[in-house]
Amino acid sequence: MLVKSCIFLSFLAIAAYGQAHLKYTKEMNDPEYVQQNVHHQGHGHAHGGHGHAHDADGGCPYAKAAAAEAATAAAHDHGHAHDHDHGHAHDHGHAHDHHGHSHDEEEDHHHGHAHDHHGHSHEDHGHSHGAESAKQVGDEYQYTGFLSFLNDAKTRLWVYAISATLLISAAPCFILMFIPIQANTSESGPLLKVLLAFGSGGLLGDAFLHLIPHATPAGDGHGHSHSHGHSHGGGGHSHGAHDMSVGGWVLGGIIAFLTVEKLVRILRGEDGHGHSHGHSHGGEKKETKEKDSKDKVAKKEEKPEKDEQSIKVTAYLNLAADFTHNFTDGLAIGASFIAGTTVGIVTMITVLVHEVPHEIGDFAILIQSGYSKKKAMLIQLVTALGALSGCVISLFSADADALADAAASSWVLPFTAGGFIYIATVSVIPELLENSSFFQTVKEIFAILTGIFLMYLIAIYE
């Protein structure tokens, strides 16, 4: 029994040794079996330590081939890092080129072929993205109709910028059509004063919250970084000198508008006063009985005539200041559309909301001057020439951004702000002090605050 057991155990040992020897022989003579076996058994090791396994295998081509296959599978499986894995796999293939074994050369060729195919798919992918991008940028209008000319970038820029400028100039006129005022009559007097109050609030808000901050380095937006850095390079004195110049130009605008109005009133006042005086004295000599009544009528008519002349001068000054202001707005619109369509549209909306209080105030001043509603609206369109000229100059300029920044940092904005302050405080607000009830005063103050608040919102948005 013991002998049989020993024989049986010996037989099992011989069988196990033969199977192991057979397996070793197959591994050494069957490359496909080596690739499958090594790939399945050692895949985790090759993937986890790819470079380490390559250095430790020495001259065994089958282990290196298996490691190459594992690297290929890892490069394809990890799709989130195509560029990194793809380049790493090429380094591995380059290492295989140093081995001269024929089987390794075959595996290396196959490995390189797989990577060539992978690279080709990447090129196709990039080509697809490039075609899609070109389609979106170059062929914005694919119609064969009248809009096809907008596919040209330069034509599209001009059409967009000029159209935006015309829209800003024409849109307030549509709002003015719904204002129930036809002329300066006693019936429309209370509403007209409310509009004058709203316009004066818009002028003051525009001057103190928009024009003056844009002319100073502290609120210069994009230009702030350039002027501020330049100021620090030249010392703090330059910063203070610029602030002083802004205040000086504001005062200069106030004095200039005062001087112009005084000169115009002197010239027109002498003619009107002489005519009124001569007519009064002539009537006094011819008809002594009607002297008192005519003097009373002459006094009543003389004051409205002087007031009308005063407000007409104010209307002309306001149109001149508004023309200059619209010129700077046109420069900004042109530069914005050069920067991009989205930037241009945002700037257009901002300027449009900003211009509505201005146009309503200008309309009220023109109506108060004696113009009819239709004539006042037509005169308002004259100021659109300032915006158009500014936009065209900006589009023709080689550096539109620098041109807009130069206009913003020059004397134009603070000088215009001084004119707006003068018109609001000297010419418009005194009109609100005459013949006002308590309820009318409340409405006028609320209108002034509304105009200022709109400019405040626009300043925050900008």
Swiss-Prot record:
Topology class, membrane: Multi-pass membrane protein
Main location: membrane
The organism's place on the tree of life at top rank: Eukaryota
Keyword Hydrolase: no
Chain segments carrying region Disordered: 39-134, 219-239, 270-307
Single GO MF annotation: zinc ion transmembrane transporter activity
Tissues expressing this chain: Expressed in somatic tissues.
Residues carrying sugar: 184, 326, 435
Localization annotation: Membrane
Biased composition (Basic and acidic residues): 75-94, 121-132, 281-307
Stretches with biased composition (Basic residues): 40-51, 111-120
GO CC aspect terms: membrane
Species annotation: Caenorhabditis elegans
Matches recorded under Pfam families: Zip (PF02535)
Protein name: Zinc transporter zipt-7.2
Comp. bias intervals (Low complexity): 65-74
Upper taxonomic lineage: Eukaryota, Metazoa, Ecdysozoa, Nematoda, Chromadorea
Any one Gene Ontology BP term: zinc ion transmembrane transport
InterPro entries: ZIP
